[in-house]
Amino acid sequence: ATVDIGGGTTDLVINDYSLDYGENGGSGSNAYIIPTQRFRDGFKVAGDDILLDMIRDVVVESLTVGLKNAGLRDPEPILSELIGDQALKVQDALLRQQLTLQVFSPIGLRVLKEYEGYDPMQKNNTLNGKTFSELLEDVEKPTESVLDYINEPIRRALGNANFNILDLPVQVNLERIHSLF
């Protein structure tokens, strides 16, 4: 069986394979591998959708919990403005996009990478409680302008000049992620 998770679809193909030795009739080492397709199906759930789910369910949820723990009673309005679908000035829209590319997507991909090695029988989870910064160690550090875009409004709302999104822990529950699939 082959599973191909692409950007737009996930495709499943199940083949049987046989060897064709041609005129040699089984002697020698030259043979053709002949596939016979038994099943093929495609699904509209793809890699981009899975990454989006990880960003929503893990990264943004951890950000929301982190803001509540930092003292922000209702993080929804500020998050809606910073990372929601509200219309922004062109410069802020670009920074929102860069926040996703430099912070949210790499963390989502890191969670998916950890999930690839997840064994439901072992229940190992080496990511839970690591900070945004720790999960971004293997990629280029986010730019100051991107960090300022998210940190400054939150600092003002919290009255805490030292707030930094990179210090927040990420709550990763691989068992829960496993149950979603």
Language-model region placement:
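Phosphate-binding glycine-rich/basic clefts of nucleotide- and phosphate-handling proteins
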Residues: I14-L174
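C-terminal or late-domain output modules
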Residues: N173-F181
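Short acidic, Gly/Ser-rich segments with clustered Asp/Glu that frequently serve as metal-coordination loops
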Residues: G6-D11
